[in-house]
C-alpha cells in the first residue's frame, strides 16, 4: 500500500514539474503538442478512474484524436479538466499539460445613466477624516492592553528564571545572571 501511495505521489510531482497550464473555452477544440519524437508519443490522463489512463484508444468519457506526436481534444467540456502527460516510448522526452476548462464571458455595455451618476458622486467625494482622540476604537485599546500585559509577563518570567537559576546554581558564574538580589 505504501509503495502504491509513493508511486502516485511521485507521479503527481513529476507531472506537476515543468507543466504547461492551458485554459480552453468550453466547447472548443485544442491540440496539445507532444514532445519531439523518435517513434510514437503515448498520451495519458492522470487523475481519471485508472491512475494512468491511456486515452488515445478510448472514446469515453472524452473524445480525442491522436497522430504520431500531438493530441487534439474535441468539443471540450468540464470532463476534460486535468493533467495530460505525453511521453515518447523510446526516449526520455515528455510534455505535461494542466488543462483548465473555462466559460466564455460575455461583456455588457454599461448603462450611460449609471456612468453619469458615478461622475456626480465623484464630484462630491470628500477625503476621509482621521479619528479624533476621543473616538479611539475599543479594539485598538484592547490590543494595546494585551501587548502590554504579555510584555510584563515575559519580563516577570525572565526575572523569576534568573533568581531560580542563581539559587540552584550558586557556584556557576554567569555574566548575564550576576544579580545582587
From Swiss-Prot:
Glycan attachment sites: 29, 57, 70, 75
Keywords, in A-Z order: Early protein, Glycoprotein
Main function: E3 proteins seem to be dispensable for virus growth in tissue culture cells. They are potentially important for virus growth under special conditions; E3 region may help adenoviruses to evade the immune surveillance of the host.
Protein name, per record: Early E3 20.3 kDa glycoprotein
Pfam families to which the protein is assigned, alphabetical: Adeno_E3_CR1, Adeno_E3_CR2
Transmembrane segments: none
Homology family: Belongs to the adenoviridae E3_20 family.
Source species, domain of life: Viruses
